[in-house]
């Protein structure tokens, strides 16, 4: 699945969870994906959300994409990885 195809499937889910900003990073963006690669997604919600909301988003994305998904928030990025991730991210929302 290419980036545009991912975006088309992901956006309706992100809108339901009131995500105001989102990006894909990792192997999909770097062109290193394999058949069993997960999809790494960064999100920022419109308002305060709970850990259950984040888990619900992850589960729904995995069901939608039929693939393992890692969901991180922009605020949760580790300082040592933040610059690299932000440089390679492909904004989808």
Language-model segments: which ranges?
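Conserved beta-strand core positions
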Residues: 22, 39-41, 69
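Catalytic metal-binding acidic patch
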Residues: 26, 32-50
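Metal-dependent nucleotidyltransferase catalytic core
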Residues: 45-75, 80
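Helical scaffold of the NTase/Pol beta-like nucleotidyltransferase catalytic core
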Residues: 1-21
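Short hydrophobic/aromatic patches at helix-to-coil boundaries
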Residues: 87-93
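Short, charged recognition helix plus adjacent turn
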Residues: 80-87
């Amino acid at each position: 699945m290419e980036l545009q195809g991912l975006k088309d499937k992901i956006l309706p889910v992100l809108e339901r969870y009131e995500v105001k900003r989102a990006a894909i990073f990792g192997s999909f963006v770097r062109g290193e994906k394999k058949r069993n690669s997960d999809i790494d997604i960064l999100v920022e919600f419109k308002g305060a959300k709970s850990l259950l909301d984040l888990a619900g988003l992850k589960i729904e994305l995995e069901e939608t994409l039929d693939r393992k998904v890692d969901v991180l928030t922009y605020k949760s990025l580790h300082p040592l990885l933040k610059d690299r991730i932000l440089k390679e991210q492909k904004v989808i929302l």
